[in-house]
Swiss-Prot record:
PROSITE patterns: BHLH. Residues 75-94, 101-130, 246-263 have a biased composition (Polar residues). GO terms for biological process: autophagy of mitochondrion; cellular response to oleic acid; mitochondria-nucleus signaling pathway; peroxisome fission; positive regulation of transcription by RNA polymerase II; regulation of transcription by RNA polymerase II. The modification Phosphoserine is found at S81, S123, S142, S227, S236, S241, S269. Keywords: DNA-binding, Nucleus, Phosphoprotein, Repeat, Transcription, Transcription regulation. One of its GO terms (molecular function) is sequence-specific DNA binding. This is Retrograde regulation protein 3. The modification Phosphothreonine is found at T150. Residues 285-344 form the bHLH domain. The 9aaTAD motifs are transactivation domains present in a large number of yeast and animal transcription factors. Residues 75-130, 243-274, 374-395 are annotated as: Disordered. It is found in: Nucleus.
């Protein structure tokens, strides 16, 4: 309750200071209105009907500057003794003195269109009953109202006395607008942080934070005032602060607003969500997070071990070394997987050795095949000559059966002939073992090999002779009689 009373007393004091400052501003504005001089002609008259809405862009810009200046004055009163003690913070009087030396508020000397609405007039005393933005509109008979309510002839005279170069001064607008824009942004942040507490002012103010910007205030002040960015001939009438965006333009006001709104939060402080937790709660959250990570890791390990169990053959996994059936667990699965991988590695090594041996054998056989292909003409000639001799001998045996001994002698002669040309054949084949043997015992070895080679033909000839002539060389007719009787 004491806090509410103190807040109300402070608010009352601020309102009194605001009233006093408003009176000072009223007197200063009245002094700024100059009377027309006769040495100017009508060439400098600017008709409001030449622009949409009946107001020139210069009028619109000056109205915005005037509103920002007024908000800056209110902000200086609401900031308290701390803002007044700072020598670098401009007050309302110093703001106006700087603005008066540069501009004379063109909206005091220009008339609005016939259909334009007059400015809403609200008393400062209605700040506790109406919305805050309406209380910050004109709290007195402003020079704009006076200019709209004066006779037409006087307004024409005032407009005629304005120099042409004075209407288009932009450097003065930059300084004034940047200064007032900073103050208006500080006003909105200070009201949000200091005055507008929900306990004491929720019933007195219908505060809307978005209504304190220049665009929203200008829309409240006069519905037909357009923003300077969309006005007619914007390149000629707008200041460089609107065209180029200086340091203190509304786009960069977030620095001052954030510094005022977050004055209680230091650069190294934690957020409010974590700042309200105790040490036990922080430790508990850390432990829960660690447990969740550990649980996820164990689940992944279990899943991969299960996949390994599907790769190992069941005969190796489900039976122990003694052949007894067992139920595999994680340790058994890992052990049998290692054994199975070692077994596969050994198989690969054995297969590599066998493959190497087979490739060497294939190479050796290919070399032998090429050497045999080179000796094929000699072997063909040998078989052709031996075939002719055999055919002649067989014809002689068939024609003259009594010439069997001669046939045997012919066969022996053919063997001798074969013995004469056979050694070069063995030398061309390249059998080194046989070649060395033939050099030491040429006749003996070759005779034995030829005897083995021709033994089949000799045995066949002897069987035929026994069949035809009998064992004791008797008459063939007797042999046939014995064969028939048998």
């Amino acid at each position: 309750m004491m806090n509410n009373n103190e807040s109300e007393a402070e608010n009352q004091r601020l309102l009194d200071e605001l009233m006093n400052q408003t009176k000072v501003l009223q007197e200063t504005l009245d002094f700024s209105l100059v009377t027309p001089t006769p040495h100017h002609n009508d060439d400098y008259k600017i008709h409001g009907s030449a622009y949409p809405g009946g107001e020139t862009p210069a009028q619109q810009h000056e109205k915005l500057s005037y509103i920002n200046t007024h908000n800056s004055n209110d902000n200086n009163n609401l900031m308290g003794s701390q803002a007044r003690s700072n020598s670098q913070t401009p007050t309302a009087s110093t703001i106006y003195e700087e603005a008066e030396s540069q501009s004379s508020y063109l909206d005091d000397m220009f008339r609005t269109s016939q259909g334009g609405r007059p400015v809403t007039q609200n008393s400062i005393s209605s700040i506790g009953q109406g919305p805050l933005r309406s209380s910050y509109s004109m709290a007195y008979d402003s020079p704009v109202d006076r200019a709209m309510n004066t006779p037409l002839q006087q307004q024409e005279g005032l407009k005629a006395e304005l120099p042409h170069d004075f209407l288009f001064q932009h450097g003065t607008d930059d300084t004034m607008y940047n200064l007032t824009d900073d103050l208006s942004s500080s006003l909105s942040s200070s009201i949000n942080s200091d005055m507008m507490t929900p306990n004491t002012y929720s019933s007195s103010f219908s505060y809307n934070p978005q209504s304190l910007g220049p665009a929203s205030v200008s829309s409240t002040y006069s519905p037909k005032v357009r923003s300077p960015s969309s006005s007619f001939r914007a390149g000629s009438f707008l200041s460089s602060s609107f065209r180029h965006g200086s340091i203190n333009t509304p786009r960069t006001r977030h620095t001052s607003i954030s510094s005022n709104m977050t004055e209680n939060i230091g650069p190294g402080s934690v957020p409010k969500i974590l700042g309200g937790l105790t040490s036990d709660e922080k430790l508990r959250r850390k432990r829960e997070f660690h447990n969740a990570v550990e649980r996820r890791r164990r689940e992944l390990i279990k899943q991969k071990i299960k996949e390994l169990g599907q790769l190992v053959p069941p005969s190796l996994l489900n039976y122990d070394d003694l052949g007894k059936q067992i139920k595999p667990n994680k340790g058994i699965i890992l052990d049998r997987t290692v054994e199975y991988l070692q077994y596969l590695a050994e198989i690969l090594e054995i297969q590599a050795r066998k493959k190497k041996a087979l490739l060497a054998k294939i190479k050796e056989l290919e070399e032998k095949k090429s050497s045999v292909a080179a000796l094929s003409p000699f072997t063909n000639n040998h078989h052709a000559s031996s075939g002719q001799n055999n055919s002649e001998n067989s014809e002689e045996r068939i024609i003259d059966i009594r010439s069997v001994p001669n046939a045997l002698m012919n066969e022996q002669n053919s063997k001798a002939e074969l013995h004469n040309w056979e050694p070069p054949l063995y030398d061309s084949v390249g059998n080194h073992n046989h070649a060395g043997t033939m050099e030491s015992h040429p006749h003996t070895n070759i005779h034995e090999e030829l005897k083995e080679f021709l033994s089949g033909d000799l045995i066949e000839a002897e069987d035929n002779a026994k069949l035809m002539f009998g064992d004791d060389n008797s008459n063939p007719a007797d042999y046939l009689l014995e064969f028939g009787s048998g």
